[in-house]
From Swiss-Prot:
HAMAP family: NikR (MF_00476). This is Putative nickel-responsive regulator. Coiled coil: none annotated. GO terms for biological process: response to nickel cation. The keyword Protein transport does not apply. Transcriptional regulator.
Length: 135
């Protein structure tokens, strides 16, 4: 387990009151626990800006399965990025729409390229990416 370091933070009173309300509503046991989560989130967001950093995450997309050639194009793209794709989940949302969740792990630069390539396809209706640090 990593050593815990204590440090002090000075903030405006109203900022602290608002923060305390939020962490109470979310069920945090302490300010320290909430601040640690915020720090981790900030670090992960910053890593997303550094091409050589390694991250893990998921890319989700919704598309119409009956558009000619789209499923094949998505499969081709995924094969091209086999080194960062861990797994893929395919779900039929209704008779027309499919959702895929692609689990990824690797360098930010390559994962961004994969995400951009998928999200730029004409009949992909929505894409979203969620990343985390490999801690």
């Amino acid at each position: 387990m990593t050593k815990i370091v204590r440090f002090g933070v000075s903030v405006e009173e109203d900022l602290l009151e608002n923060f305390d309300k939020i962490i109470e509503n979310k069920g945090y046991n302490s300010r320290s626990e909430a601040i640690r989560d915020l720090m981790r989130d900030y670090i992960i967001k910053e890593k997303w800006n550094i091409k050589s950093e390694k991250v893990a995450g998921s890319i989700s997309l919704i598309y119409e399965h009956d558009v000619y050639g789209l499923s094949e194009k998505l499969t081709d793209i995924q094969h091209h990025y086999h080194d960062v794709i861990i797994s893929t989940l395919h779900v039929h949302l209704d008779e027309k729409n499919c959702m895929e969740v692609i689990l990824v792990r690797g360098k930010v630069e390559k994962i961004k390229k994969l995400y951009n390539e998928i999200s730029s396809l004409k009949w992909v209706r929505h894409t979203n990416i969620s990343i985390t640090d490999i801690i």
